[in-house]
Amino acid sequence: IITSALSIQDPRERPMDKQQASDEKHRRFHDKESDFLAFVNLWNYLGEQQKALSSNAFRRLCRTDYLNYLRVREWQDIYTQLRQVVKELGIPVNSEPAEYREIHIALLTGLLSHIGMKDADKQEYTGARNARFSIFPGSGLFKKPPKWVMVAELVETSRLWGRIAA
């Protein structure tokens, strides 16, 4: 779920003129310790809604929840493709959902250059090669930043932001 989510453009939309409204809609998926797990929460919600609603009603739901329907479909397609490849390679799939620790150890192996330690005086982190970044405002960790953080990507706009954090 997380791997396929990270391989596409984020399905959560945050229009400039509706940032607060979209943040409120997306907040229900937040995990207080990990934005990566927010993808799992969103995935579970979408699965429940897709089963309960007609195709058109599901599209409308995506629009009102500030979710891009085409990106959601792409996410689902990539997830299905990854499951098929894993099956063909004979790699065992968890029968139970993985725990927080196992998920983040697995993620950390691919994100070593995206680790940061919080500066005691500021809301900034110092990462690899002394890169200084802040947690993105849309993150579930933005208001209560941890001492150490791992982010999926660093994006430079008005400043350097760490997006999708744990």
PLM segments and residue spans:
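Second RecA-like catalytic domain
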Residues: 1-166
